[in-house]
Structure formats: structure tokens, C-alpha cells
UniProtKB/Swiss-Prot annotation:
A Pfam family the protein falls into: ThiI_fer
Species lineage: Bacteria, Bacillati, Bacillota, Clostridia, Thermoanaerobacterales
Record field: transmembrane: none
The protein's enzyme class: transferase
GO molecular function, one term: ATP binding
CC terms in the record's Gene Ontology section: cytosol
Cysteines paired by S-S bonds: none
Binding site residues for ATP: L178, L179, Y203, F204, R260, G282, Q291
Name of protein: Probable tRNA sulfurtransferase
Domain of life: Bacteria
UniProtKB keywords: ATP-binding, Cytoplasm, Nucleotide-binding, RNA-binding, Thiamine biosynthesis, Transferase, tRNA-binding
Length: 380
């Protein structure tokens, strides 16, 4: 009898001819997450992925809870195809559940096993009742569902630890996220990673108006995001000169929207170089002046690449709740200004017209900044 973890996945099972691609990517990501555990083996057999580990199983579970594509993690016992061994595993798993109700459910893909599913369930239930006091059977609404699977080996398990869900990272291409250091953009990056998208990040740094601590905050956000499966390449773009050019030469009501358009143009150039197929932002409809539907239309027109906005229909409370869940919130609220919070006009345009914004942009020579920006690349 051996302690193992059964890995449950949801959407992957619906992927038809591509199912093996998604499963193999998930296995690769699990191995990466557990790469510093010496005594760990990850295997796939008959539509099941399981992890064998001789070390700290609780720490292994914590790592697996951050692997996209896993919907559930189950502590299980793997035994030989022997009823006595299955009984021992079932009794071991049910210890600590005294006073509760339970039900045994058996699946028997291995039809060569001499007992059918109903007979296995009946015999396992009887063994549990014989060895553990104060248990009752409830086939309709049990407190504990004890599962037995008869495959090339027997698997016995009860209860599921919730996983993070989504699709395995790396199954849906790459995108570049504009990471400001605020609450929203790291959540947006995380949501796209959950859909299988690898990310690189761009941060616009405006010294001396923004401090090194503001940049450090973004680096720390990337460190948190990297815990979900990949090292993140952060492009730190020096934005001061272009931002001052905008502030000095453009009408105040358009400075914010023009700044956003310049950021998009630079981010698109970086994205094209790194193989990204889209940009990601943390914009939420109507949250600020630059996030009205008119402003987003004008922003979109600055680039040809798709812009994904996974937070578009969320309110601030929902975004904060998710930021807290993924452990980025406390970093995001550190009191260091980023380039989006400096030079903010008193009355920004909320319904800008594209032709008027382009006319305002032409008052400055922005193309040289787009073509020859200075960047620092940090791999986190």
C-alpha cells in the first residue's frame, strides 16, 4: 500500500483529439512545480494522473494548488488488486471520521477483477463498519464518500482538495501584460495565465517621479505570479522623457489617454519581439476616465494587436477579493506612485474622439520615443 495523490482535471477531459497535448503539458507543469522534491514521481495511466511522493505530502499539495489545470487533489492509497489490501486502505482513510455517515462508491474499469462494483462496495463498507465504531451508512447524502477504483492497481480515496482549475499554462500561447504595480493588472495577468497563456510583463518607469521602490514592487508582483508556474520576464521601460513630452505639448484633457496610447505602442513592439499574440491590461469598464468605452476605443486604435481585458466586467470589490486570494493585494497597496498616477489632469476627457486625440498627438514628436525606447529586462 502506498500513499499517492490523484490529480483531477476538468476541461482537459473535453478536449477531444487534443486531450493528450493538454494532459502532457499539465504533467510537465506538475513536474516543474515539484522539481525540488527528490522523491516525487508523476505518472499518467488510463486517464488518471497521479503523484507518488515520499516526502512532505502537505507541501506537495500546496505546490499543486497553484498549478493551473488541476481542479482537485485527492489523498489516496494505491494497493495491489487484493481485497484485503483494499480493506486496509479503506479503514486507514476512514480513521478520524467516527460519528459520520459514509457511502462506498466503486468504479471497475478493469473487468478482469473477479468482483463487480456493487460487491466491492458492499465488502469494503462491511470492513469499514467492522473496524471503526460509530459510523453509519447513508447512500443518499453521506458526510464522506469513500471511492474505490479498480484499474491495473486499486485506488482508494475519500475527499477532494480544491485545485485552482483553468487550463495548463502554455497551452494557449503567449501575451504581454502592462503591469503597473496597482491592484488590477496583476489580477488580469493571473486570469490570463489561468486560461493557459504564458505572459511577459512591461512596466513603465518614470524616474525621478517614480521611485526604485515602485519598480521593486512590480518585481515582487512578478515573483508572486511566477509561483503559478513560470518564470516571468519583466521589461522595465524608461518612460520619463516621453511622459514629459506628452505633459508639455498635449492638451491636459488628453494627456492620460495619449499616455495610454503611447504605452500600448511600446508594449506592442516588445510583444512582437517576444512572440506574443496579444496585450493584456487590467482595465475595468467605467472605473476611471481612461476606461470608459469611448476611451478604450481610442486606446485600441493605437495598436493592431488584440488587447485582452479579463477584468472588464468586474467591479473593484471583486478585483480586490481576487487579488487577496492570489496574494498580490498587499504588495499592490504599498504606497509608491507609478507613472499612471503622476501628472494626472484635473478634468480628463471621458468621451474622447479619436480624430481629436490623434490631432493632439501630432503636436509632439513621439515616434522617436517609440522607435528607440530604453529598457531593462529582469527575469523573475
Amino acid at each position: 500500500m502506498q500513499d499517492i495523490l490523484l490529480i483531477k482535471y476538468g476541461e482537459l477531459a473535453l478536449k477531444g483529439d487534443n486531450r493528450s497535448f493538454f494532459e502532457n503539458k499539465l504533467i510537465k507543469n506538475i513536474k516543474h512545480a515539484l522539481s525540488d522534491f527528490k522523491e516525487v514521481k508523476v505518472e499518467k495511466t488510463h486517464g488518471r494522473i497521479y503523484v507518488e511522493c515520499d516526502g512532505d505530502i502537505e507541501e506537495v499539495i500546496e505546490r499543486l494548488k497553484k498549478v493551473f489545470g488541476i481542479v482537485g487533489i485527492t489523498k489516496a492509497k494505491k494497493t495491489d488488486l487484493n481485497l484485503d489490501e483494499i480493506f486496509k486502505a479503506a479503514v486507514e482513510l476512514m480513521k478520524g471520521h467516527e460519528g459520520k455517515t459514509f457511502k462506498v462508491e466503486t468504479k471497475r474499469p478493469n473487468k478482469s477483477f473477479p468482483y463487480n462494483s456493487m460487491e466491492v462496495s458492499r465488502r469494503v463498507g462491511a470492513a469499514v463498519l467492522k473496524n471503526i465504531k460509530n459510523l453509519k451508512v447513508d447512500v443518499h447524502n453521506p458526510d464522506v464518500l469513500l471511492n474505490v477504483e479498480i484499474r491495473e492497481m486499486a485506488f482508494v480515496y475519500a475527499g477532494v482538495i480544491e485545485g485552482i482549475g483553468g487550463l495548463p499554462l502554455g497551452t494557449n500561447g503567449k501575451a504581454t501584460v502592462l503591469l503597473s504595480g496597482g491592484i488590477d493588472s496583476p489580477v488580469a495577468a493571473w486570469m490570463m495565465m489561468k486560461r493557459g497563456v504564458e505572459v511577459e510583463a512591461v512596466y513603465f518607469h518614470s524616474p525621478p517621479y517614480t521611485s526604485e521602490r515602485a519598480k521593486d514592487k512590480v518585481v515582487d508582483l512578478c515573483k508572486v505570479l511566477s509561483q503559478y508556474g513560470q518564470r516571468i520576464k519583466l521589461h522595465v521601460v524608461h518612460f520619463t522623457d516621453l511622459q514629459l513630452e506628452i505633459y508639455e505639448k498635449c492638451p491636459p484633457k488628453f494627456t492620460t489617454i495619449i499616455m495610454r496610447r503611447m504605452m500600448m505602442k511600446i508594449a506592442e513592439k516588445i510583444a512582437q519581439k517576444n512572440g506574443s499574440m496579444a496585450l493584456i491590461t487590467g482595465e475595468s469598464l467605467g472605473q476611471v476616465a481612461s476606461q470608459t468605452i469611448e476611451s478604450l476605443y481610442v486606446t485600441n486604435a493605437s495598436v493592431s494587436m488584440p488587447i485582452f481585458r479579463p477584468l472588464i466586467g468586474m467591479d473593484k470589490t471583486e478585483i480586490i477579493d481576487l487579488a487577496q486570494k492570489i496574494s498580490t493585494f498587499e504588495i499592490s497597496i504599498r504606497p509608491y506612485e507609478d507613472c499612471c498616477t503622476i501628472f494626472v489632469p484635473k478634468h480628463p476627457a471621458t468621451k474622447p474622439k479619436l480624430d481629436k486625440v490623434i490631432e493632439a498627438e501630432e503636436k509632439m514628436e513621439y515616434q522617436k520615443y517609440i522607435d528607440d525606447f530604453e529598457e531593462e529586462v529582469i527575469e523573475v
